Regions:
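Charge-rich, acidic-biased intrinsically disordered regions
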Residues: 76-84, 113-116
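Iron-sulfur (Fe-S) cluster-binding segments and ferredoxin-like electron-carrier domains
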Residues: 67-79, 105-108
Protein backbone atom coordinates (compact mmCIF):
# COMPACT_ATOMS: atom_id res chain seq x y z
CA UNK A 1 0.00 0.00 0.00
CA UNK A 2 1.22 3.46 -0.91
CA UNK A 3 1.95 5.76 2.04
CA UNK A 4 -0.03 8.99 2.23
CA UNK A 5 2.80 11.37 3.08
CA UNK A 6 0.51 14.36 3.56
CA UNK A 7 -1.44 12.40 6.18
CA UNK A 8 1.74 10.97 7.73
CA UNK A 9 3.18 14.47 8.18
CA UNK A 10 -0.06 15.71 9.74
CA UNK A 11 -0.16 12.77 12.16
CA UNK A 12 3.46 13.37 13.14
CA UNK A 13 2.74 17.08 13.67
CA UNK A 14 -0.06 16.15 16.08
CA UNK A 15 2.02 13.61 17.99
CA UNK A 16 5.03 15.93 18.21
CA UNK A 17 2.78 18.71 19.50
CA UNK A 18 1.56 16.35 22.21
CA UNK A 19 5.15 15.52 23.13
CA UNK A 20 5.83 19.26 23.26
CA UNK A 21 3.34 19.55 26.10
CA UNK A 22 4.50 16.39 27.88
CA UNK A 23 8.27 16.87 27.55
CA UNK A 24 8.64 20.56 26.74
CA UNK A 25 12.35 20.84 27.57
CA UNK A 26 13.72 18.42 24.99
CA UNK A 27 11.08 19.26 22.38
CA UNK A 28 11.62 23.02 22.71
CA UNK A 29 15.37 22.53 22.53
CA UNK A 30 15.05 20.42 19.40
CA UNK A 31 12.66 22.95 17.82
CA UNK A 32 15.19 25.74 18.42
CA UNK A 33 18.01 23.65 16.97
CA UNK A 34 15.90 22.81 13.91
CA UNK A 35 14.94 26.45 13.34
CA UNK A 36 18.54 27.69 13.57
CA UNK A 37 20.01 24.87 11.48
CA UNK A 38 17.48 25.30 8.67
CA UNK A 39 17.38 29.09 8.38
CA UNK A 40 18.98 30.82 5.41
CA UNK A 41 22.70 31.38 5.76
CA UNK A 42 25.58 30.55 3.44
CA UNK A 43 23.23 27.80 2.26
CA UNK A 44 19.60 28.58 1.54
CA UNK A 45 16.81 26.89 3.47
CA UNK A 46 15.82 25.17 0.22
CA UNK A 47 19.28 23.62 -0.18
CA UNK A 48 19.34 22.55 3.47
CA UNK A 49 15.93 20.88 3.13
CA UNK A 50 17.14 18.95 0.09
CA UNK A 51 20.25 17.90 2.03
CA UNK A 52 17.97 16.69 4.81
CA UNK A 53 15.89 14.79 2.24
CA UNK A 54 18.99 12.96 1.00
CA UNK A 55 19.95 12.11 4.58
CA UNK A 56 16.38 10.92 5.25
CA UNK A 57 16.75 8.42 2.41
CA UNK A 58 20.10 7.19 3.75
CA UNK A 59 18.79 6.62 7.28
CA UNK A 60 15.47 5.17 6.06
CA UNK A 61 13.12 7.62 7.78
CA UNK A 62 9.74 7.93 6.04
CA UNK A 63 8.54 10.61 8.46
CA UNK A 64 11.68 12.62 7.75
CA UNK A 65 11.07 12.24 4.01
CA UNK A 66 7.55 13.62 4.48
CA UNK A 67 8.77 16.59 6.49
CA UNK A 68 11.71 17.52 4.30
CA UNK A 69 9.93 17.13 0.96
CA UNK A 70 7.10 19.31 2.29
CA UNK A 71 9.49 21.92 3.65
CA UNK A 72 11.69 21.90 0.52
CA UNK A 73 8.61 22.48 -1.66
CA UNK A 74 7.55 25.26 0.71
CA UNK A 75 11.03 26.77 0.29
CA UNK A 76 10.65 26.73 -3.51
CA UNK A 77 12.27 23.45 -4.55
CA UNK A 78 11.28 22.12 -7.96
CA UNK A 79 10.77 18.52 -9.01
CA UNK A 80 14.14 18.38 -10.85
CA UNK A 81 15.94 19.78 -7.78
CA UNK A 82 14.20 17.33 -5.45
CA UNK A 83 14.99 14.42 -7.74
CA UNK A 84 18.67 15.39 -7.80
CA UNK A 85 18.61 15.32 -3.99
CA UNK A 86 17.00 11.87 -4.21
CA UNK A 87 19.89 10.82 -6.46
CA UNK A 88 22.40 11.95 -3.84
CA UNK A 89 20.47 9.94 -1.25
CA UNK A 90 20.70 6.91 -3.52
CA UNK A 91 24.44 7.39 -3.97
CA UNK A 92 25.06 7.65 -0.25
CA UNK A 93 22.53 5.00 0.80
CA UNK A 94 23.35 2.27 -1.72
CA UNK A 95 20.97 -0.68 -2.05
CA UNK A 96 18.93 -0.06 1.12
CA UNK A 97 18.72 3.63 0.24
CA UNK A 98 17.26 2.73 -3.15
CA UNK A 99 14.08 1.52 -1.45
CA UNK A 100 13.61 4.92 0.20
CA UNK A 101 14.10 6.75 -3.10
CA UNK A 102 10.73 5.28 -4.13
CA UNK A 103 9.20 6.61 -0.90
CA UNK A 104 10.71 10.02 -1.65
CA UNK A 105 9.22 10.02 -5.17
CA UNK A 106 5.77 9.30 -3.72
CA UNK A 107 6.18 12.16 -1.24
CA UNK A 108 7.38 14.56 -3.96
CA UNK A 109 4.35 13.75 -6.09
CA UNK A 110 2.00 14.24 -3.13
CA UNK A 111 3.41 17.57 -1.92
CA UNK A 112 4.43 19.23 -5.20
CA UNK A 113 1.67 20.83 -7.26
CA UNK A 114 1.10 19.31 -10.70
CA UNK A 115 3.46 20.54 -13.39
CA UNK A 116 6.30 21.67 -11.10
Amino acid sequence: MKTDYVELRQTLEERLAQLGTEIPGPMTGFARLHKKAMEDGALSRKVKEMMALAISIVVGCEGCIAYHVHDAVEAGATRPELLEAVGVGLLMGGGPGSIYTAHALDAIEQFLPEGN
